[in-house]
Curated annotation (Swiss-Prot):
<dbReference type="InterPro" id="IPR013320">
    <property type="entry name" value="ConA-like_dom_sf"/>
</dbReference>
<feature type="glycosylation site" description="N-linked (GlcNAc...) asparagine">
    <location>
        <position position="189"/>
    </location>
</feature>
<keyword id="KW-0325">Glycoprotein</keyword>
<dbReference type="GO" id="GO:0052576">
    <property type="term" value="P:carbohydrate storage"/>
</dbReference>
<dbReference type="InterPro" id="IPR050551">
    <property type="entry name" value="Fructan_Metab_Enzymes"/>
</dbReference>
<keyword id="KW-0326">Glycosidase</keyword>
<keyword id="KW-0119">Carbohydrate metabolism</keyword>
<dbReference type="Pfam" id="PF00251">
    <property type="entry name" value="Glyco_hydro_32N"/>
</dbReference>
<protein>
    <recommendedName>
        <fullName>Beta-fructofuranosidase, insoluble isoenzyme 2</fullName>
        <ecNumber>3.2.1.26</ecNumber>
    </recommendedName>
</protein>
<dbReference type="InterPro" id="IPR013189">
    <property type="entry name" value="Glyco_hydro_32_C"/>
</dbReference>
<keyword id="KW-0732">Signal</keyword>
<dbReference type="GO" id="GO:0005576">
    <property type="term" value="C:extracellular region"/>
</dbReference>
<keyword id="KW-0964">Secreted</keyword>
<dbReference type="InterPro" id="IPR018053">
    <property type="entry name" value="Glyco_hydro_32_AS"/>
</dbReference>
<feature type="active site">
    <location>
        <position position="69"/>
    </location>
</feature>
<dbReference type="InterPro" id="IPR023296">
    <property type="entry name" value="Glyco_hydro_beta-prop_sf"/>
</dbReference>
<dbReference type="InterPro" id="IPR013148">
    <property type="entry name" value="Glyco_hydro_32_N"/>
</dbReference>
Length: 598
């Protein structure tokens, strides 16, 4: 296609790429797209989009180009490793390799050369996502999806081994000649067969892992494969689990302690005795290809039957999500250094593909989160890893016992808030003004938030934060709570329903932005009137954690006015009931050493 320089051809290509990006565009095979030179011909890209102040300051992001799924995170010989899907040639999806970065603290990162690139027949047309497993001798092994037929998008599973296990940086990886080690036999859909998980070892000495797939037109499936040597694999007679949700990408399956401790559990460690099994629950997470979000269930793993059963029979229908915002293709790993489980997730851009090409970069990784089982046993709790607090400035701004009346907003001054960490505890004096929850929206937080956003006056709430706000409030991103009385059911009272929402509909004056509201119900008891919120603000991303990590929302925003020193922070209350900020603490966030100083 030799006419990329023409306006017509460029417009057509931008439309194609935008459609791919909005659909996720994570698993498509096409020829090389080298669009960097063509970026200068793009019309209609606002100057604010290419402003360097919109590039994140402390989130994981390479200096340029496209990234997506986090792959094979691990801790090895004193170093944290993160591999990730990366296009070395441009800011759109394509030419994917496994980029590789290492860190001592999960905050400051050094980029190494790509670890896995197309080089053998079994991955000639793509090296897609996968996971790492620590063998009994402590050596890591990577399993990943390869594409070896471009015409039908045929997917197989391959293995890669470190060339030198004594190298703590694992700078070189080799692919044995016996790849691929798993192929889609027995009626499996070869075009929907990918993303092998971390393996775990059973009492019988066999390793087991999952591969995500699609059965029929709509059934997501996690197939179980067994092996003694990571070379010869056999599929189990039945899947670990399946549900009518659409294709399951990037499955993740891991144990969590069920006895109230926040410690992680190594996936590869066998739990064989009944007493130990009683102290452990299992989490099965899947990334929904059609809906572009991650959901999980908590349940029981029957090792003899090779089956997983969610505790909630409706768990595959009423999805609990890691994050109700822009967060996908997640992967956890066990950190033996601090005995915790850490969650990584990809956040794509929400501007256009033309914008991404113009600015030269697309995609970030969310701040790593520690995850553990809530004492209720019903869901996970998530919290930014403690290391991120090292980036906080020395002197925080503190606001205490500040009453915010109905319709009032209060500016938080004394710091630059475009790159900040804000923790706030709210108190609601009375819940009597809470509105009745519409039964039609009792299971649809997103619809409820869209219908009644941050500016819609309510009873108890909306109250929360306006972040990345301009001086005249022409631009603002709202992160807030709203409290409802439960929908009437048989005359029972029930506990109040808490909605958490991020509303970016006024985040930018740029009319071309994708600015959806994001929302989730928070499973918390607010009858005492107390609830907390933490927001990590980083120029073009807002990551928020409600009620101690019971609900999380990540949103990408691109202000044109509220940039750098012009960004402001407010507490607001658009409800009828007054609220009190019992304490707000806000820190400016420093920039880490990211990707060799970028």
């Amino acid at each position: 296609m030799g006419v990329l320089g023409s306006r017509v051809a460029w417009a057509w290509l931008v439309q194609l790429l935008l459609l791919q990006q909005l659909a996720g565009a994570s698993h498509v095979v096409y020829d090389d797209l080298e669009l960097q030179a063509a970026a200068t011909t793009a019309d209609g890209v606002p100057p604010s989009i290419v402003d360097s102040e919109l590039r994140t300051g402390y989130h994981f992001q390479p200096p340029k180009n496209w990234i997506n799924d986090p792959n094979a995170p691990m801790y090895y010989k004193g170093w944290y490793h993160l591999f990730y899907q990366y296009n070395p040639k441009g800011a759109v999806w394509g030419n994917i390799v496994w980029a590789h970065s290492v860190s001592r603290d999960l905050i400051n990162w050094v980029a190494l050369k790509p670890a896995i690139e197309p080089s053998i027949r079994a991955d000639k047309y793509g090296c897609w996502s996968g996971s790492a497993t620590m063998m009994a001798d402590g050596t890591p092994v990577i399993m990943y999806t390869g594409v070896n037929r471009p015409d039908v998008n045929y997917q197989v599973q391959n293995v890669a081994l470190p060339r030198n296990g004594s190298d703590p940086l694992l700078r070189e990886w080799v692919k044995p000649g016996h790849n691929p080690v798993i192929v889609p036999e027995g009626g499996i859909n070869a075009t929907q067969f990918r993303d092998p998980t971390t393996a775990w070892r059973g009492a019988d000495g066999h390793w087991r892992l999952l591969v995500g797939s699609l059965a029929g037109q709509s059934r997501g499936v996690a197939y179980v494969y067994r092996s003694r040597d990571f070379r010869r694999w056999t599929r189990a007679a039945q899947p670990l689990h399946s549900a009518p949700t659409g294709m399951w990408e990037c499955p993740d399956f891991y144990p969590v302690t069920a006895d109230g401790r926040r410690e992680g559990v190594d996936t590869s460690s066998a739990v064989v005795d009944a007493a130990a099994s009683a102290r452990v629950k299992y989490v099965l997470k899947n990334s929904l290809d059609l809906r572009r979000y991650d959901y999980y269930t908590v349940g029981t793993y029957d090792r003899k039957a090779e089956r997983y059963v969610p505790d909630d029979p409706a768990g595959d229908e009423h999805h609990i999500r890691y994050d109700y915002g822009n967060f996908y293709a997640s992967k956890t790993f066990y950190d033996p250094a601090k005995r915790r489980r850490i969650l990584w997730g990809w956040a794509n851009e929400s501007d256009t593909a033309a914008d991404d090409v113009a600015k030269g970069w697309a995609g970030i990784q969310a701040i790593p989160r520690k995850v553990w089982l809530d004492p209720s046993g019903k869901q996970l709790l998530q919290w930014p890893i403690e290391e991120v607090e090292r980036l906080r400035g020395k002197w925080p701004v503190i606001l205490k016992d500040r009453v915010v009346k109905p319709g009032e907003h209060v500016e938080v001054t004394g710091l630059q808030t475009a790159q900040a960490d804000v923790e706030v505890s709210f108190e609601v004096g009375s819940l009597e003004a809470a509105e009745r929850l519409d039964p039609a929206m009792a299971y649809d937080a997103q619809r409820l938030c869209s219908a009644r956003g941050a500016d819609a006056r309510g009873g108890v709430g909306p109250f929360g934060l306006w972040v990345l706000a301009s001086a005249g409030l022409e631009e603002k991103t709202a992160v807030f709570f709203r409290v409802f009385r439960p929908a009437a059911r048989g005359g029972g009272a029930g506990k109040p329903v808490v909605l958490m929402c991020t509303d970016p509909t006024k985040s930018s004056r740029n009319p071309n932005m994708y600015q959806p509201t994001f929302a989730g119900f928070v499973d918390t008891d607010i009858t005492n009137g107390k609830i907390s919120l933490r927001s990590l603000i980083d120029r073009s991303v807002v990551e928020s954690f409600g009620a101690g990590g019971k609900a999380c929302i990540l949103s990408r925003v691109y202000p044109s006015l509220a940039i750098g020193k012009n960004a402001r922070l407010y507490v607001f209350n658009n409800g009828k009931a007054e609220i009190k900020v019992s304490q707000l603490t806000a820190w400016e966030m420093k920039k880490p050493v990211m990707m060799n100083g970028a």
